[in-house]
Amino acid sequence: MQSIVPLHGFGGVPYSAVRKAAPKNLLDNSDFTNLVAQAGIGGNHGTTAYAADRWILDSGTVSYEAGVGLTLNGTIRQKLEFPPTGDTSTFVGMASGEASISYADGAVTITSSGGVLKWAALYAGVYTDATMPDYHPKGYGAELAECQRYYVWFDRYLSNGLLTSSATNYYMPISLPVAMRCQPTATSSGWIGRISTGYSKYTGSTKKAFNSLWISDFNGCRLSVCDSISTATDANNINVSFMVYDLEFCADIL
């Protein structure tokens, strides 16, 4: 393999200088022209309003056009799981219009009256116009994986579960796309249905709303969703297939 840069000691530069890493952008979902919004722009994660993943909508409204940016009339905020440890940090962003930016207590806050946000970055340490690194989007896939540490939404999920305790509870294992920050809370405005019997085991309906969700057996990338089923007529401890619609897991830092 041909070396592009001559090795140190042969008239070249030190290898360590070539390999010096660019500073890490500490913000998640920082490219406002290609946003991750699993619950939709301005949607709720649980009971909390979000402009998009990781960006809490503290006040006002937002709208979005892919490739253009996020129009903000209000305030959004991102709380960092691992804030910078030094005394000084540098925030940089790009917007069409005006926006005010602040950083305190491990959170970045952006306020604007109609400005269109393009991107944002937070770096540990002090940078000037001359030393500030160029902004490079991480890419949608990388941003989605980072965001799913804090929030995961399933439009639908098929799983083999267990109906037990006199057919009043079910346990449904779910594999998460990434390890979540902590044991999440599970919420849903959707429903669950039996696959193997065409949902016929649920009295008076082909589908059933969730009753009282809880989580068990959480190990980072896997958990079991549990709920009570008062209308099922199955025997104890049988394996069944469930289809779940509109199920979310929240583990963000508020």
State where each predicted segment sits:
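Extracellular and organelle-lumenal recognition/adhesion modules and their flexible linkers in secreted
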Residues: 4-254
